[in-house]
Every structure is written in structure tokens, then in C-alpha cells.
Design a protein with these regions (language model features):
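Phosphate-binding loop of NTP-binding sites
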Residues: 19-23, 43, 56-60, 69, ...
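Gly/Ser/Thr-rich loops at beta-strand to alpha-helix junctions
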Residues: 9-11, 71-72, 113-114, 224, ...
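ATP-dependent carboxylate-amine ligase
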Residues: 1-34, 38, 42-49, 60-61, ...
Length: 447
């Protein structure tokens, strides 16, 4: 079989291409921007890449074109495919049909923590001799790659709710048919494709309706949104947990920053975790990962030992530099809840030392202004906050809600202010779901 992948350098599509090549399928593809590290990963797997979407690059003997969700009508390659009647399929459907068939799919979903939990579960399984397959939309420091076919029936996939393709507006995870599903949390996000939280709930409900009666849903029982989705119709087994109450499966932090915590079932302690991750969101991720692995048959002691050695995921409280008593961090947080827990975790770790937060309003939901009223409370743990936005109305709203928020329209504007800031014993954290114009290194070069 010979496939051609459109949008091949994206994390998901690039991982899919690697899996297909590992399966013995002949793979090539194209993308608008061909850049490291994905281009080198693909080339090392014998996958040829064309830059741009020139229809002339489409192999004449291709059996199937796999279309990424960044591809829209009007793309010259898509128009060529439609005009000539060439067979095409979405990435998630291809994955389901050709790579996940007869696998025990373990889907990690939710608004936050998908990459971290997927990485944790994969690490624990591999550490315990389970050669699982996996596809993760981020780079875990404990794993050699972001995707592997594996030989065991278990396949771990980061299952997001974003739409499948221009011709299939259902969420990607609809295609995966998991036997084990974690919904770690559920809030409004992706304002570019969802108009309300109800729209997102419908997609999660569609996912639950496709699960068999022998499948298992793992979820935090204190999350009202998830419970409301279940009330719409739920037919599988459930394994609830919580971080708010001391009943059933739950966790108790031992240290204020949650870098040490114990896991209980009712009143009986089952495991103790001591790791480098911090924050209550990390505690919940750890508890969820533990229960996913427990449901797959692993022993508590083995799970705890592996999780305690978890090194983390790139762009999750990543210390990118430590210079002149200033620590500079990079973090992917771009939703008020994730921002809040990230900054609270850092505050509990560093005590009274100064925290400066740089927040780029980059995601579609953040740019829409939907979260403007929540941002001031989310960043309250920081001493000083610089919001990067060019929306004057948004800036006015944010500055009026908090005395420690200051606006910057560009990274250069902030860098000009840098020399006037008191930086001794400071933790400077940059929050964005993009590259932030390389501001982390620019700061380190100037201090």
C-alpha cells in the first residue's frame, strides 16, 4: 500500500506517518512548512517530504491520500484530488482502520493534561516490560519518540476533541473506539470550532455512545461537566476518582507543591509518589495515570516506582535557563485553569521568591476574549504579569481587573522593559501554546 500524507509535519500526522511506515506501508507526504525536528524524524524513517502543496508532487501510483485537519478547501492538492477522484481519508480514520484494528486502545482525553498523562502511562507500561504502541502530540523526556507501533495489544493515544478534517467535523477521538478511556477534565476550549461548552459535551457524549459495555471510563467524579455528559447516556464500566474528597480512589498531597502525594482507596493507602512535577494539576494527572495503569493490570508498587521517575514533558514547566539568579521557564499553559494550577504550583515550590509571568494571548479561545474575566484570578500567584495582546479592549479589561497586570504588544516591547525590572532571585515563566517568538532565549541573552 502507498499513501501520501497532507500536513505531514504536524505532530499527529507526523506520528501517524511513522506508524504507517513501521507497519510496512510506503509513506511520503508534504507540508507548508518543513522544519526540524519532525522533518529529520520522518527522513530517518525513510519518509520523503515535499515542501508546499504542489499537485505535481502527488505520486501517480498513490493508493490513498491521508488528509490532515489543517488542510482546507482551496488547497491546490485537495482540489486536484477531488477533481481526479483520488481516494482520500482523514488522519484519525486512517489510524483507526489501518493501525488500531484489533488493538486495545487506551484513549487519554480532556481539556488539560493529555500529553502528560499519555506520556506517563506509556512510560509505566514500557518500564514494566509492556511493549505498547503509542501516539503522543508532544515530546516526553522519558521516551525516545512521539510514536511507536509496539507489539503488545495496548495502544496509548492522546485523544483530543478537535475536529477531524474539513470533510468530517466530528472530534478526532470519535474514530478511536477505546476500550479504556480517561476523561481527565472538561471545560470550554477551541472557540474557533465550538460555540459553547454544550457543543463540546455533545462530542464527548458521541464518544461514550460508541464504547462497548465491557469498556472502562476513568474520570474525576467531582467534575460536573463529565457527569452531565454521562447522564446523556452511558453504557460502559466506570472507575471514578477524585482529588476533592477522601472517598473511593483519591490522592492526598504530602508536600504543599504536590511533588509528593499518596494514593488511597477509601482509607487504605495504595501508593506513594515522589517526583519532580509540581502543582495540583500534576497530582491529578499522576492519580489518573496510576488508575489507567492499574486498570490495565499493573501492580501498585510497579506503577508508583515508574511514576516517581517521570521526567516530564517538554514545555511543561521546562527550566530553559538559570542565569544571574533568574530562572526562566517555558510552559504550554494557555487556558485559565492550566495557568492557575501552573502558577500556584510554582508559588508553593519557591515560597516568597518573585514570580514574573509572561502570558501570550495566542490560542483562538484566548483571542476571542472568552476567558478575559478569568485571567486575573488565574495569574494571581504571580507578583508581576505581562500580557501579550494587541487587542485594546482585551487589554483594558485585564488591566482594570488587576493591579499587577501590564500589557505588551510585542516581545521586543517587553525586552526593552527588561533592564528596568528588579530580577534578583526571580522565577520568570513564559506561558504560550506557540513559540512566543523565542522570547525565552532572548531574555537569557540580555540578563
Amino acid at each position: 500500500m502507498k499513501i501520501y500524507v497532507l500536513g505531514i509535519c504536524g505532530t499527529f500526522m507526523g506520528g501517524l506517518a511513522q506508524l504507517a511506515a513501521e507497519k510496512g506501508i510506503k509513506v511520503s507526504g508534504c507540508d507548508e512548512n518543513v522544519y526540524p525536528p519532525m522533518d529529520q524524524v520522518l527522513l530517518s524513517n525513510g519518509i520523503a517530504i515535499d515542501e508546499g502543496y504542489n499537485p505535481k508532487n502527488l505520486p501517480k501510483d498513490v493508493d490513498l491520500v491521508v488528509v490532515g485537519n489543517v488542510i482546507a478547501r482551496g488547497n491546490p492538492m485537495i482540489e486536484e484530488i477531488l477533481n481526479k477522484g483520488i481516494d482520500f481519508i482523514s488522519g484519525p480514520e486512517f489510524l483507526s482502520k489501518y493501525l488500531l484494528a484489533k488493538r486495545h486502545v487506551v484513549a487519554i482525553s480532556g481539556t488539560h493534561g493529555k500529553t502528560s498523562v499519555s506520556s506517563m502511562v506509556t512510560k509505566v507500561l514500557l518500564d514494566n516490560g509492556v511493549d505498547c504502541g503509542y501516539l503522543i502530540a508532544g515530546r516526553a523526556k522519558d521516551l525516545e519518540a512521539t510514536a511507536s507501533l509496539g507489539t503488545h495489544e495496548f495502544f496509548i493515544i492522546e485523544a483530543d476533541e478537535y475536529d477531524t478534517a474539513f470533510f468530517d467535523k466530528r472530534s478526532k477521538f470519535i474514530h478511536y473506539h477505546p476500550k479504556t478511556l480517561l476523561i481527565n477534565n472538561l471545560e470550554f476550549d477551541h472557540a474557533d470550532i465550538f460555540s459553547s461548552l454544550s457543543d463540546i459535551k455533545k462530542q464527548f457524549h458521541h464518544l461514550l455512545r460508541l464504547m462497548s459495555s465491557t469498556s472502562t471510563l476513568i474520570f474525576p467524579e467531582h467534575n460536573i461537566n463529565i457527569k452531565n455528559v454521562m447522564k446523556m447516556g452511558f453504557y460502559s464500566q466506570s472507575l471514578p476518582f477524585n482529588t476533592k474528597f477522601t472517598r473511593g480512589w483519591h490522592a492526598k498531597k504530602v508536600t504543599a507543591d504536590s511533588s509528593k502525594f499518596d494514593i488511597y482507596k477509601d482509607n487504605k493507602k495504595k501508593a506513594s509518589i515522589s517526583w519532580s512535577s509540581i502543582g495540583e494539576h500534576s497530582l491529578q494527572n499522576g492519580l489518573a495515570s496510576y488508575l489507567v495503569c492499574k486498570s490495565l493490570g499493573l501492580k501498585s508498587k510497579d506503577i508508583a516506582e515508574s511514576l516517581s521517575e517521570f521526567k516530564g514533558v517538554t514545555r511543561r514547566m521546562d527550566l530553559v535557563g538559570d542565569k544571574s539568579s533568574v530562572k526562566v521557564y517555558d510552559d504550554f499553559a494557555h487556558h485559565p485553569t492550566a495557568i492557575k494550577y501552573t502558577l500556584e504550583g510554582l508559588r508553593k515550590k519557591v515560597g516568597s521568591e518573585k514570580i514574573i509571568c509572561l502570558l501570550e494571548m495566542r490560542s483562538n479561545t484566548m483571542l476571542s476574549g472568552y476567558h478575559d474575566k478569568k485571567i486575573p484570578k488565574a495569574v494571581a500567584s504571580a507578583d508581576q504579569v505581562f500580557i501579550f495582546s494587541k487587542d485594546k479592549k482585551q487589554i483594558s479589561t485585564l488591566e482594570s481587573e488587576s493591579n499587577n497586570i501590564e500589557a505588551c504588544s510585542t516581545t521586543q516591547e517587553f525586552l526593552r522593559k527588561l533592564s528596568s525590572l528588579e530580577l534578583e532571585n526571580t522565577h520568570l515563566i513564559c506561558l504560550s501554546n506557540g513559540s512566543f517568538d523565542g522570547i525565552h532565549q532572548a531574555i537569557l541573552e540580555r540578563i
